[in-house]
């Protein structure tokens, strides 16, 4: 491609509303242009990268024998009403009516559609297992779209769906897709982790997220330094601590704590550390109006874990202070588990404390030297807390460490959630109708592009991994407009590299060298070749890698093989 015939428009200034590096650099390099809130046009340069992502994904999906199809973006409301998600999916579902007042949504995902198709197409166990995928535009009505294409309202996604009759078959396909995702991100040159994750609104029995590691990532990931264990903050657990091996010999004592309402205030007032206290949170229950959740004072409640407890209402709902005072006759800052006449669920780390300070269920009063069993009873012990840096890994191997990531893929073992709701069944080997079970496998095509930039950039611009770069090589002829020798040699080099199937940009614009070099660094082309009269006199071409500040001279007759070897490494 010749730059003079290419739409190459770069910007020196960083747009004011671009908060993170990928958003800034995608705008400055001319990859995208904003149309509206969370809506972006992919310009020619950006589209080249997007297509490379799609091609890698498509190749690896095809290797798993998944079959590509394309489903409508607009979906009838009846399908979503069958599964109950029309009401529960929330405000991110963009709904509309046609001229006949029939309701539709612009699909954020396609579980209902694929299940509807397959319940009509699949009749026998002989047709299973099957796996279908599509690469398609989705829409989620984000309240606050931000970070460019990282959290846009319209985005491109690869979503795949598999159908099975046995858990064993589902697990086999799940493993194949998991490995395909690993190959995809390996080929893209990205540093990533596959982490255990909550199934969220999609549902199912098991799931893994694929997180591209980046300091700007919104997700917290915990991983072991001595094993393969990794999970996001919602799912991460630590090794369960043993119960206190020594009984508390101190007498429980009621003390005054005037106007001390928070854990930090109580701990400071009593001259103790916050990890010597416990806190009691009152939430809505499933069968009981209120349920108490008890954690060590220095721990944070993990709301996702809490909602999985059978006694806790989902979504999690905290009881307001006025209702607590009216029902429990205790102000919020003085609540504790002793003689609390509602179900009490205690976190394992709180249960491991030999003694603790807790609210006394009287205004401005706390107990010190309280102990479980002797003084405080509980209904269940459960993992309620967010893990912390330095916690022991749940597999007993190593310690947990924290990093940040950007979720770019998510695979789920759905089970029969959608098939059961939509009566998707086939005849099994015994001649009986059996509900199918499903897996689903999502990968954010547009988000991968932004995540790659977040992981691969410097103060000058993007540093593309070779597999994703819009062009692999940039040839810059210095003063090509005035030097026929430079122009001809650059053209010859351009044609030779093209003949070997290499993506080459010949930057033949009539610009100063500084502008051409700066644009190359901004766009992030991995390999730069500079053709100049001075170097040609020595029979050389100047080479520079985007990852290095050093340049080197390559003999003219060796430069093509030199580039081919670099690209094939």
UniProtKB/Swiss-Prot annotation:
InterPro entries: aa-tRNA-synt_IIb, aa-tRNA-synth_II, aa-tRNA-synth_II/BPL/LPL, Anticodon-bd, Anticodon-bd_dom_sf, Pro-tRNA-ligase_IIa, Pro-tRNA-synth_IIa_bac-type, Pro-tRNA-Synthase_IIa_type1
A Pfam family matched in the record: tRNA_edit
Reactions that this protein is recorded to catalyse: tRNA(Pro) + L-proline + ATP = L-prolyl-tRNA(Pro) + AMP + diphosphate
GO cellular component: cytosol
Entry EC no(s): 6.1.1.15
Compartments where found: Cytoplasm
Top-level enzyme category: ligase
GO terms, molecular function: aminoacyl-tRNA deacylase activity; ATP binding; proline-tRNA ligase activity
GO biological process: prolyl-tRNA aminoacylation
Keywords carried by this UniProt record: Aminoacyl-tRNA synthetase, ATP-binding, Cytoplasm, Ligase, Nucleotide-binding, Protein biosynthesis
Principal location listed in the UniProt entry: cytoplasm
Database matches in Gene3D superfamilies: Anticodon-binding domain (3.40.50.800), Bira Bifunctional Protein, Domain 2 (3.30.930.10)
Coiled-coil positions: none
Role according to the record: Catalyzes the attachment of proline to tRNA(Pro) in a two-step reaction: proline is first activated by ATP to form Pro-AMP and then transferred to the acceptor end of tRNA(Pro). As ProRS can inadvertently accommodate and process non-cognate amino acids such as alanine and cysteine, to avoid such errors it has two additional distinct editing activities against alanine. One activity is designated as 'pretransfer' editing and involves the tRNA(Pro)-independent hydrolysis of activated Ala-AMP.
Domains (record comment): Consists of three domains: the N-terminal catalytic domain, the editing domain and the C-terminal anticodon-binding domain.
Record-stated family: Belongs to the class-II aminoacyl-tRNA synthetase family. ProS type 1 subfamily.
Subunit structure: Homodimer.
Protein name stated in the entry: Proline--tRNA ligase
